[in-house]
Amino acid sequence: SNVESGVTTTFVLTPGGIESNLPDWIIPASLTLNFLAFACAFAGAYQLIRGFGERQNLALGGIAGVFIFAFLVWAAADNSLNIGGLMNSTLNKAVPLTLGAMSGVLCERAGIVNIAIEGMMLMGAMVGALVGSLTGNIWLGILGAVIAGALLGLIHAVLSIKYLLDQIISGTVINIFAGGLTAFFSAKFMQTYQELNNPGILKPFAIPILSKIPIAGPILFNNNIFIYAMFFFLIVLTVGLFSTRWGLRLRSVGEHPKAADTLGINVFRTRYMAVLLGGMMAGFAGAYFTLGSVGRFDEFMTAGKGFIALAAMIFGNWTPFGAFGAALLFGFSEALAAKLAILGVKIPSEFLLMTPYILTMIVLAGFVGRGQMPAADGQPYEKE
């Protein structure tokens, strides 16, 4: 490493603006980097000579964690980095990705490919800002966003279930439609009349007692309603999909629709319901951009997050918590890029902005085909 001996790295453990008695964590940068480099080299040699066998994925995860930690030590050498703030930012960046991925899980578990998550998010973001501004009520804005997502979900469902249109084409049409319509509304009305684009923003609120837990408390329990809702939906969807009759029926329709139909399950109704729920979830994810994060709508502000959410869904093996883990990974890369720009690290800012998208491509290249996608995913069903 090019870090001089005697230089220290300071990690601040509590997000900014929150009172805490936790001392900062000060570590010798050069010594730590040399030790971590030796540990990685040892792990590599062990893999070559004996191999980690079944524990290979665990070992790879551990080495990746060590590498990231070493990178943070190097980046913040002779400086300080707010780790608590980085983790809080990671969680916030992961919210729309997780909600979008859960939208994908709902649809694809029922056998409908939904690449229209991006368009649904964008429409949800715009309608949320517009309704919130017109009514002066953020909660009505969220409701408007959810309804907008549901309407696009209904269009996708009718095109792909009733008219048997190719699901990828249907999703692409919705993305283009949503992009054009939101850009038109934004340019024509929302940028011209600022009172139509000022919905306000949901403030974070601390959960008593839990928010006082050292380190984890301020990160997890001092947020706005979107983050708490994300955790609630994660639990509800996981239990619903894998521990209830409703979930069993939905999954059977995505695996073997013909067999499900034979057993008396209404394949069409189940798929319509799944895509509508998925649309509502994507609309809610879109509302996060305007009502939970920025407080206004800007053209194409979702910036491809709907597609990254799809990548998170695939990487998470079509399970809600798996997708959440992947969303945290993508969220971390985005939050880290922002922090490194502040630290003035000698890496071009354009490259830092590309990081989440590069990571998406790497993940998809390595993971597509390995996961267990639903057997009838993307296949239209016709009753005989």
Question: What residue spans do the PLM features occupy?
Answer:
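Cytosolic-side transmembrane-helix boundaries in multi-pass membrane proteins
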Residues: 1-17, 31-70, 219, 236-237, ...
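Transmembrane helix-bundle core of multi-pass membrane transporters
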Residues: 10, 15-23, 179-242, 345-352, ...
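Single transmembrane alpha-helix segments in multi-pass membrane proteins
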Residues: 44, 85-134, 152-168, 314-317, ...
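Alpha-helical transmembrane segments within multi-pass membrane transporters and channels
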Residues: 136-179, 232-235, 334
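Helix-loop-helix "hairpin" substructures at the membrane interface of multi-pass membrane proteins
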Residues: 220-296, 320-321, 325
